[in-house]
Amino acid sequence: MAESIRRKLALVLVASLLALAAPFSVADTKETIEAGASQALGRLRAHSAAAGELVDQAHAVLVFPDVVKMGFGVGGEYGEGALQIGGVTQAYYVIAGVSFGLEAGAEYKSEVILFMTEEALRDFRNSSGWQVGVDGAVVLAKEGAEGAIDTLNSREPVLGFIFSNRGLIFNLSLDGAKITRIAR
């Protein structure tokens, strides 16, 4: 019961933070999202040649160039992105999530999700809202020997990368994040 109350309070807090920030935020335009996606993919390729090869092998790439995560004890994250097939944007999406733990402040990161099979892409596109860990699993890149990306999980249907300007981030998760298509 205490856990239920804690979660409800957390949701109210996150909703309040988002409501306060709403008047100051403007939804990104198609051009802004696409330019950000292109820059994010360039940074990912610069961080890891193996990641670039996986991007090239993917049936589709979902790029969230600027995901902001903020909170104090309870946090939330939000970002807008583009689904690209063959380098051409097909649709626009938002990613949002709530997290619990020792958090304070705000951080920016990029998230890239690779659909390695046609079936995984079809399941994603046919959903009205896709929750990571519920509607499909995203296997995040793992650090292998000598700091390289472990490509053993490249056989998974959906792969993910989280990174900042400093490089790949290996200790985070996308579980629980909700991805929803938006009109642009």
Annotate each predicted stretch with a short phrase.
Residues A2-L13:
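Bacterial N-terminal signal peptides that target proteins for export
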Residues A27-R184:
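Small-residue-enriched, tightly packed secondary-structure blocks
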